[in-house]
Design a protein with these regions (language model features):
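Glycine-aromatic micro-motifs
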Residues: 1-138
Length: 138
């Protein structure tokens, strides 16, 4: 199965910390969506947004165990949904991603999430906060 990652999971170190496995990712784009910072957090929420495009990473070869871990990691504010991802060169691939639920969208700020800022200012602390996540028995 495929995963379109757009937030902290675009970083291999986070993906490994959550799933305990390494996956090859490739750049991809999700049209008609936008990602905004969640209030009081350093990670984003993804919502539909006509005309906007989100840059991310497409991971392939994930199994059920990996998705169970990802479901837990993402938590109650997100729902896993199937989306059509632009994988480049005119190739569109069906992948799962995590959409911020309508009931929680009031928790999103007006600030678009920036991967470079997250990587330089927050990635290390984020990994420290979520270290040991993979011990969860699925």
């Amino acid at each position: 199965m495929e995963l379109f990652a757009y937030g902290s999971l675009i970083f291999n170190r986070v993906m490994y910390a959550v799933t305990g496995s390494r996956y090859d990712g490739r750049p991809a784009r999700l049209p008609d969506h936008a990602r905004y910072l969640v209030q009081g957090a350093t990670y984003p929420g993804l919502i539909p947004s006509v005309g906007s495009t989100v840059e991310g990473v497409l991971y392939s070869g994930l199994g059920n165990r990996a998705f169970r871990l990802l479901d837990r990691f993402e938590g109650e504010h997100y729902r896993r949904s199937s989306v059509a991802v632009d994988a480049g060169n005119g190739v569109v691939i069906e992948a799962d991603t995590f959409i911020f639920k309508d009931d929680y969208q009031h928790l999103l700020t007006d600030e678009l999430w920036d991967s470079g800022t997250f990587e330089s200012a927050h990635l290390t602390a984020f990994l420290d906060e979520y270290s040991g996540f993979t011990w969860i028995d699925t």
